[in-house]
Amino acid sequence: MNQKKDEKVINQAVKMLTISEDEAGQRIDNYLLAKLKGVPKSLIYRILRKGEVRVNKGRIKPEYKLQANDIVRVPPVRVSEKEHAPISTKLNKVSQLEKQILFEDECLLVLNKPSGIAVHGGSGLSFGVIEALRTLRPDARFLELVHRLDRDTSGILLVAKKRSALRSLHEQLREKTVQKDYLALVRGQWQSHCKVVKAPLLKNELSSGERIVRVSEQGKPSETRFSIEERYEYATLVKASPVTGRTHQIRVHTQYAGHPIALDDKYGDKHFDEQMTQLGLTRLFLHAFSIRFEHPKTGETLRINAPLDPEMKKILGALREQKSSN
């Protein structure tokens, strides 16, 4: 088949790849996303669905977990030049990701993720943090997200550079030995006695594909600890420490407590959001500012902090000024 003018061949011919011990344990879709850099997620799923990708000569589903010594057949892949445009040209923020790396060694990378960038491509997004990092680190054999952050939430994001590091960090998350702290600017005066919110959360998917979470007895047990950092006239800066890790947990728990987060398009308060917009806020005020965990290789306790972005600092400064002038 002739190559079209506006097409780029990512994989010239059929490749038979043997899975190493380090590559084992990951899903085939994630493996292909890393191997076929620049190929849209939709195309990866298409070649999996059509059976063009095979493992040990058999068809597999996207969620298939690779085993050591599996033999993966990867077909030739063509994408349009437009689709293959370097990620950094698609969004200026992504080219700034390099400057947002807080810590990096041979095992892991810790990023201060900007607001507005998804951690993964998909859902109508052509790229995410992980795809951008694979572009910034073309020689990295392994780059996988350890956990997730909502697109509009900024702050600390852990990325494993080795399968062994990913396993160790996932185990720490399961054992609840990872301490994660967030800063959230919420409506009104947070009550001093409200130190823990325990409310089960149920995830729903709307017909549009949008995910929405609500408090429900049918939901999963969920717990967030809160402490007051600073009070303002009509808002409070709180520290939120999730004990469980449910989707939108902090956002729904603050709303449930009667204090929604500033500029939360799903769970927020219109009047409060208007006040915040007038001060210059353009994004959800939720930031993962601190994490503590054991280094997967050395066992040393690491504590990493991510500074607030300039916009958040400016908003807090404006709120302090308002408070002192009244």
UniProtKB/Swiss-Prot annotation:
Domain S4 RNA-binding: residue ranges? 26-98
Catalytic residues (positions) = 150
- Provide a GO biological process annotation: enzyme-directed rRNA pseudouridine synthesis
Q: Which reaction does it catalyse?
A: uridine(955/2504/2580) in 23S rRNA = pseudouridine(955/2504/2580) in 23S rRNA
The record, for Gene3D superfamilies, names: Pseudouridine synthase, RNA-binding S4 domain
Q: Which Pfam families match?
A: PseudoU_synth_2 (PF00849), S4 (PF01479)
Free-text function comment from the UniProt entry: Responsible for synthesis of pseudouridine from uracil at positions 955, 2504 and 2580 in 23S ribosomal RNA.
Entry's family note: Belongs to the pseudouridine synthase RluA family.
Q: What is this protein called?
A: Ribosomal large subunit pseudouridine synthase C
